[in-house]
Amino acid sequence: LASIARGLLTPAKAQPAPFDRSIVRQMAREAASKPFKAPDNKLPDNLKDLDYDHYRAIRFSPDRALWHGEKLPFEVQFFHRGFFYANRVDIYEVANGQATKIAYQPEYFSFGDNAPPKAGVDLGFAGFRLHTPINRPDYHDEICVFLGASYFRAVAKGELYGLSARGLSINTGQAKGEEFPFFKTFWIEKPGANATSIVVHALLDSESAAAAYRFTIRPGDTTVLDVEMAVYPRVELDHVGLAPMTSMFFFGPNDRNDVDDFRPSVHDSDGLAIFNGRGEELWRPLHNPKDLQISTFSDLNPHGFGLMQRQKNFFAYQDLESGFERRPSLWAEPIGDWGDGSVQLIEIPTKEEVHDNIAVFWKPKTALQAKGEHTYTYRLHWGPDAPKPSALARFSRTGVGAKGEDSKIFVLDLVGEKLKSIDPKSVRGVVSAEKAKVQNIVSQPNPATGGWRLSFELSVKEKVPVELRASLVQGADAISEVWVYRWTP
């Protein structure tokens, strides 16, 4: 009787079919050889026009989770379609080399004030989330979610959701308009009883390309996603983004943007970090511009890049509900040579914190040719910092303020073990600017942080953007990463 009851509580399944990773690539290859077919987004009348609050009222029942009660390290819960998430997503369980489709049942969900769909209607799902005991051994925490277009996000131990990653970006920041690829099918491999990772396969489609993915997800103090992807363009892709990520920067000490708010900062990420192929480490603080801005960091075979949340102190935010200090950083580590290209940073004006206004991705220099196969492998690290903390001092805070007419003062704080024992007399700040005058450069220990403070004044006569670079050096040797910034009048 117990086994029968458990069967009634777990998701219904269809007939199995053989599966291996090559099948997803073959499906993507075949899809790209045919005209694009728009996704199924048809919903019953009572679901297609849901607002945010009514959609939130539809909740998955945890006791219906895939593998619930089987004493496995992972469980899967599903999202209902509706609101922004109208597209149908099909999800399969893979076990013993067989893929079995998870059939939609309205009984998996509670609908609040919403009328449930009619029985027997197969709506599919909008997406899913993975649960595992990451914070304590007796509770399956949510650690990763795939929901909406090709968006996904994850958290490490003790963290809250923040920025998102995407499977692929196309024409982001281009005048002709962005194209949003979407995951249409997932295959989730059933883990063993002692598994520390879980594997998810995905099929992506879009007007311009199809793609196949294999994600290996390893939760922990840093949650790591190994991503293997193969892209099959229908047309030449000259503005494609690899390892794309999306975040929010509303305001901070470098850019309050005329916001009247009791909080000192509001952001999911405060800067872009790059470890380029030349071995140079860059830090670019984010800002909320008045107009769309695109920054290009040309490179050859980058070691990594990511959107960081370096401010981990509650007092930097003063927000009891949002917990910005617990939002993760996201670092993308290419595996193998990615060749010529650039890290692209796109900053979009926003007047509200609810909008993601920051995009970062790797743009290959050479367009991806139609009818070909283009493969990439990379590793995404979700956690408190980049996976391999640098020996160089790093910039932890950027403050900007007025300093008389046509002048600004920049105050940059740095932290790092090396700074605690260095001879202050041997350290100097190096600052350069295009189309502006830099003066009063001061570098000194910061006893409040145990680090260092570099400050300077910038005089600007022309109302044009100014590109800035700053670092700390000891003799001819760099002892900090390089701070780069675009100041816009």
Language model regions located:
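N-terminal export signals
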Residues: 1-14
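Terminal accessory/anchoring regions of large secretory-pathway or extracellular enzymes
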Residues: 15-52, 58-61, 79, 316-317, ...
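Solvent-exposed N-terminal domain segments of exported/luminal and surface proteins
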Residues: 29, 33-176
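A contiguous, surface-exposed recognition patch within enzymatic or periplasmic domains that forms
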Residues: 51-53, 145-147, 238, 242-373, ...
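A mature extracytoplasmic/lumenal domain signature
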Residues: 95, 106, 202-204, 219, ...
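Short, hydrophobic/aromatic beta-strand segments
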Residues: 102-103, 211, 237-244, 318, ...
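Extended, loop-rich substrate-binding clefts of extracytoplasmic carbohydrate-active enzymes
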Residues: 157, 162-220, 339-347, 351, ...
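Acidic, contiguous internal or C-terminal segments within carbohydrate-active enzymes
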Residues: 202-251
